[in-house]
A protein has these predicted regions:
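The alpha-helix within a helix-turn-helix
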Residues: 34, 45, 159
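C-terminal secondary-structure termini that scaffold catalytic or DNA-interacting sites
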Residues: 188-208
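Short, basic (Lys/Arg/His-rich) helix/loop patches that form interaction surfaces
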Residues: 18-19, 117-160
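Catalytic-site neighborhood detector that most strongly recognizes the C-terminal catalytic loop/helix
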Residues: 63, 162-187
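Short, small-residue-biased leader/transition segments that mark boundaries at the very start
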Residues: 1-2
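Conserved tyrosine-mediated DNA breakage-rejoining catalytic core shared by Y-recombinases
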Residues: 37, 41-42, 46-80, 168
């Protein structure tokens, strides 16, 4: 069973990103979309300018997996990272609405594989120990879900943030809430019936 990344580890990965390069600025914006919202990599790849409302601080899109609308507040740090990328690092090409592009000619939109590759590189370059832990884009989705569960955020809020259609879809995140589970261990039931007799068996009573 893979362990989730802690909030401290996620912060360490974010801090380790080299934002002095165009790729670093782009990847940092991608990383914040993952760590703050848990957006699926395919939806990040498909993100377009019409999905970003900088004036009203909103981000919205139709999820490719479910076909449902996903909409959230555009957090200040995410807004700043996106604007930094768009204004200073994104290639200036026409007739392309996709936000995230490759850094080399011919410029083209990133796909989900490229998103996952970029995330893997960022994690690998950080000092975070990823042994026995997920470390792709899905790892951040699992981490944000588990951290919300640990913080006792309602399942309805977790469901909306992750863009799940039903409450049942987040059950496996609740199973990952090891910290809280350890605080409420189940009591050992008192033995009864034949099981009780077996436990009280004495060798001297059964000698022939």
């Amino acid at each position: 069973v893979y362990k989730r990344q802690t909030q401290e580890e996620v912060a360490a990965i974010e801090d380790s990103v080299d934002c002095t390069t165009a790729a670093g600025v782009r990847n940092y914006a991608i990383l914040l979309l993952l760590s703050r919202y848990g957006i699926r990599s395919r939806d990040i790849a498909a993100l377009s300018f019409e999905n970003l409302d900088f004036e009203n601080d909103r981000i919205h899109f139709i999820q490719q997996k479910t076909g449902d609308l996903w909409e959230m507040e555009l957090f200040p740090e995410v807004k700043a990272a996106l604007q930094d990328y768009i204004l200073t690092a994104r290639p200036k090409i026409q007739n392309c609405q996709n936000v995230f592009l490759t850094t080399m000619i011919p410029y083209k939109p990133l796909d989900s594989y490229a998103i996952n590759t970029a995330v893997g590189i960022m994690v690998a370059k950080s000092d975070v120990n990823i042994a026995e832990k997920r470390h792709g884009s899905r790892a951040f989705r699992s981490s944000i879900a588990s951290n919300m569960v640990n913080d006792k955020v309602s399942t309805e809020v977790v469901r909306k943030v992750l863009g799940h259609g039903t409450k049942h879809a987040i059950r496996h995140y609740a199973r990952m809430d090891i910290e809280n589970m350890r605080l409420c261990p189940l009591p050992t039931p008192k033995p009864s019936g034949i099981f009780s007799e077996m436990l009280s068996w004495k060798e001297d009573d059964h000698l022939v």
